[in-house]
């Protein structure tokens, strides 16, 4: 499993539908980048100048919304993930 460092979070990107309700298939390069996913791993938090860790607001299994162009896409064991800084997460879906 991927283990993020510092204030980074690993998100399993939700697979968006590739076909519209009317049956039209959308080319992968025409689809917008998804902005929601499930948190699968969380780093220990950023380190302050005095050596204290700042805990993150998200935890594993949280459904989140993140900035459209945030993070780095990573493929690991055939699954697509996004590794981003916690500050790029906009909201937790409850």
Curated annotation (Swiss-Prot):
One of its GO terms (molecular function) is protein folding chaperone. It is found in: Cytoplasm. The keyword Flavoprotein does not apply. Gene3D superfamilies: GroES chaperonin. GO terms for biological process: chaperone cofactor-dependent protein refolding. It holds the Pfam family Cpn10. The keyword Cell inner membrane does not apply. It comes from the Bacteria. One of its GO terms (cellular component) is cytoplasm. InterPro entries: Chaperonin_GroES, Chaperonin_GroES_sf, GroES-like_sf. Keywords: Chaperone, Cytoplasm. PANTHER family: 10 KDA HEAT SHOCK PROTEIN, CO-CHAPERONIN GROES. Together with the chaperonin GroEL, plays an essential role in assisting protein folding. The GroEL-GroES system forms a nano-cage that allows encapsulation of the non-native substrate proteins and provides a physical environment optimized to promote and accelerate protein folding. GroES binds to the apical surface of the GroEL ring, thereby capping the opening of the GroEL channel. Belongs to the GroES chaperonin family. Heptamer of 7 subunits arranged in a ring. Interacts with the chaperonin GroEL. This is Co-chaperonin GroES.
């Amino acid at each position: 499993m991927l283990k993020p460092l510092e204030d980074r979070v690993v998100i399993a990107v939700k697979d968006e539908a590739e076909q519209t309700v009317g049956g039209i298939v959308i080319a992968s390069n025409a689809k917008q980048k998804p902005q929601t996913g499930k948190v699968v791993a969380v780093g220990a938090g950023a380190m302050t100048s005095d050596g204290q860790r700042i805990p993150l607001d998200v935890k594993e299994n949280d459904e989140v919304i993140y900035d459209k162009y945030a993070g780095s896409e990573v493929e690991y064991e055939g699954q697509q993930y996004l590794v981003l800084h916690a500050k790029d997460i906009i909201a937790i879906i409850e």
